[in-house]
Regions:
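Hydrophobic residues in well-ordered beta-strands that form the structural core
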Residues: 85, 106, 158-160, 209, ...
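Helix C-cap/helix->beta junction micro-motif
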Residues: 100, 153-154, 312
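N-terminal "arm"/small-domain region of PLP-dependent enzymes with the aminotransferase-like
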Residues: 1-31, 312, 352
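Active-site phosphate-binding strand-loop segment of PLP-dependent enzymes
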Residues: 112-200, 206-208, 350
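Short beta-strand->loop structural element characteristic of the AMP-binding/adenylate-forming
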Residues: 102-113, 317
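Conserved coil-to-alpha-helix start sites within the AMP-binding
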Residues: 88-94
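PLP-dependent aminotransferase class I/II
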Residues: 9, 38-43, 48-54, 61, ...
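Phosphate-binding glycine-rich loop
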Residues: 31, 35-82, 95-100, 106-107
Length: 374
């Protein structure tokens, strides 16, 4: 493929020598789980986001699961309670809810931003609602005063799925004054899967929050339920980031803002040069509001467009072809009327996107798209 949707080798090439050096340091240090590199990364995440606590986890799904589980252990939620979640999110958001015995309440996204339509949230609130999960999909911030007002009025937690927007900045302050995704709500789950803007070289995640009790419970839950060795407060799990991944992430975090600026530049070239009348371009939002984890267009002939681009050497992906409520594992929700999520699943297509794409390649991809004949 001449223009792959993403090449992890090329993504990590600029940091390779520095990561090799730090890997050797970790190996020679002789301590690989919950060591000083994990502690350092947690401190760096707090400093970057402007939050008080960060707890490293084994992956992004575990971050979301442990965050919600901690609220249950704290008595804030109980099985059977409801969590509002966007209907077009990746299935991990919903798995985190149902794995804890909580009930997902699907709310449709905006067809324009792809994010949760916050104007629809209040009508989904019931006596059993305990939280709103906002997902900053594709790298665009999902946060506004409407969301904050609804949460305050009904006493709801706002939890963030910040798997795709690490580094994005909201134009509206969060609950504790930060403007960074991951520190807007009461707590957030982060993913450092290798394809993310800040990606490890394996699985890794984190929970970020200003709630000290929540952070303490999450840390114990991810360590077999133990805060003190051989003393188990909870029926926990093993979900701990290793020091090697933490060290890699510390290296890459130094370059994240510049990498995100490069992604913004790539998106700008796409938006200025794709002119196909049947191609709907994504909305960029305000400055810093979109860090372009994916550049997602819409097309009513999406599958034909995807095949055409593949024949021209342009790799694409679909994020996501089946919405959660249509998955076999959630067959009890298969008949829910969620037309916007289903339309997006039929139309969205992710173009090549990374910080290393050069302008000439992006221009050529745009020219290829413009030659597509409906």
């Amino acid at each position: 493929m001449k223009y792959p949707q993403l090449s992890l080798r090329e993504t990590n090439a600029p940091y390779m020598e520095e990561m090799k050096t730090t890997a050797a340091e970790v190996i020679e240090g002789g301590w690989y789980i919950r060591g000083k590199y994990v502690s350092r990364l947690e401190e760096q995440l707090c400093a970057y986001l402007g939050c008080r606590y960060a707890v490293a986890t084994g992956n992004g799904l575990d971050a979301l699961r442990l965050m919600l589980r901690a609220y249950i252990e704290m008595g804030v939620m109980q099985p059977g309670d409801e969590v509002i979640v966007p209907s077009n999110t990746y299935v991990a958001s919903v798995l985190a809810i149902t794995d804890n015995g909580l009930v997902p309440v699907f709310v449709e996204p905006s067809i324009h931003t792809y994010n949760l339509d916050t104007s629809l949230v209040e009508r989904a609130v019931t006596a059993r609602t305990r939280a709103i999960m906002v997902v900053h999909l594709y790298g665009r911030v999902c946060w506004d005063e409407c969301l904050k007002d609804v949460a305050a009025r009904y006493g709801l937690k706002i939890v963030e799925d910040n798997a795709q927007a690490f580094g994005a900045v909201s134009p509206v302050a969060g609950l504790q004054g930060s403007f960074h995704t991951g520190a807007l709500g009461n707590a957030a789950g982060l993913s450092f899967y290798p394809t993310k803007n800040l990606g490890a070289l394996g699985d890794a995640g984190a929970v970020t929050t200003n709630d000290g009790e929540l952070a303490e419970v999450v840390r114990a839950l991810g360590n077999y339920g133990s805060a003190e060795r051989y003393v188990n407060l909870y029926k926990g799990v093993n979900s701990r980031m290793d020091d090697l991944q933490a060290a890699f992430l510390s290296v890459k975090l130094k370059y994240l803002d510049e990498d995100n600026r490069r992604r913004v530049a790539v998106a700008k070239v796409y938006s200025e040069h794709i002119h196909g009348k049947e191609i709907v371009l994504p909305e960029p939002g305000g400055e810093g509001e979109h860090i372009w984890h994916q550049y997602v267009v819409r097309c009513s002939e999406r599958d034909r467009l995807k095949s055409y681009l593949e024949s021209e050497g342009v790799g694409t992906l679909i994020h996501y072809p089946i919405p959660p409520h249509k998955q076999q594992c959630y067959r009890e929700y298969n008949r829910l009327p969620l037309p916007i999520a289903e339309q997006l699943a039929d139309e969205v297509l992710s173009l090549p996107m990374s910080a290393y794409l050069n302008e000439s390649d992006v221009l050529e991809i745009a020219r290829i798209i413009n030659r597509f004949d409906m």
